[in-house]
């Protein structure tokens, strides 16, 4: 499975083309729109989310509610584009119109300045538009399709916030993936402990009032994953490495860990490794899951536990100092529409990219033209593992 996305933040639309989805997967626009709505939710989102009510258009690869095995084309219209017709015009326009929303005061922490230097732009909006997190709309849409496939083969996925700014959320022990999904969806800040809800909302309000932003840590959990996805044979076939790349590719993500992650660097081996046991009903199991479901770059049958850290959104309503690229004089950075935090939305994106990587790996191991063959292949493999 592979995909390509295209589109600018204030352009006419966002587009994705996906290749490699097996035929026979039940799929409708509603399945995708549900996740697009989740991405637009969450406490602390800004005015852009009030303008855009994302709805996907499926224009190829699906007929009568089922995939055809051919490339799938997805499009999401940017409703806000109607206010940007001149600024985002494909055709050349008058110089005075170009100057209306020209960006020449790059924002620290964004792609503005480096992108402008790399591609020789005199208007940094050219970098801003594509580097915007608006692009993640399409990765969520793609992830929604991936999650449909995972569900068909008994794999479920969920996410929740474990750190909001500097506030760590206490997570109840031994929650299932389904329980995490339900609790997180019931929270406006995507947490699983309701006792922290109001505290986090108040914190977001105070940060917004101060013209500042906050980041945090998001945890994604995947259950029902077969043993042996990924490989130890080559560096670029390790599945945890692929997931790490996908997570850090999300806008504003600066780090990733699995299981105990960086904490394992402070412990002894006897405190970190997961003891192995065997039962007639379950086969091989681990007595703990400190390694987050991976050994040797391969899934070991335990739930995948991966966390990503998101830096605070760089656009500040009380902007930091920058430089005017025309005069090189000090100047306050440009202010674009932004949010005090986008952690709940980022969790939906993280869930989507992890699901997409997993489906790509599943389809590589269990190469199938249609969903019937895929489900049979996975079923046969699970039976083999249970009797190993």
From Swiss-Prot:
Report the enzyme's class at the first EC level: lyase
What PROSITE patterns does the annotation carry? CHORISMATE_SYNTHASE_1, CHORISMATE_SYNTHASE_2, CHORISMATE_SYNTHASE_3
Q: Give the pathway listed in the UniProt entry for this protein.
A: Metabolic intermediate biosynthesis; chorismate biosynthesis; chorismate from D-erythrose 4-phosphate and phosphoenolpyruvate: step 7/7
Q: Which GO terms describe its molecular function?
A: chorismate synthase activity; FMN binding
Q: Which SUPFAM superfamilies match?
A: Chorismate synthase, AroC (SSF103263)
Q: Which reaction does it catalyse?
A: 5-O-(1-carboxyvinyl)-3-phosphoshikimate = chorismate + phosphate
**One of the Pfam families matching this protein, by short name:** Chorismate_synt
Cofactor names from the entry are: FMNH2
Keywords per UniProt? Amino-acid biosynthesis, Aromatic amino acid biosynthesis, FAD, Flavoprotein, FMN, Lyase, NADP
Query: Which domain of life does this protein belong to?
Result: Bacteria
Stated EC number for the protein is 4.2.3.5
Tell me the InterPro entries matching this sequence: Chorismate_synth (IPR000453), Chorismate_synth_AroC_sf (IPR035904), Chorismate_synthase_CS (IPR020541)
| Similarity comment text for this entry | Belongs to the chorismate synthase family.
Q: How does it assemble?
A: Homotetramer.
Q: What role is this protein assigned?
A: This reaction introduces a second double bond into the aromatic ring system.
Question: What is the name of the protein in this document?
Answer: Chorismate synthase
Q: What is the lineage of its organism?
A: Bacteria, Bacillati, Bacillota, Bacilli, Lactobacillales
Q: Which gene encodes it?
A: aroC
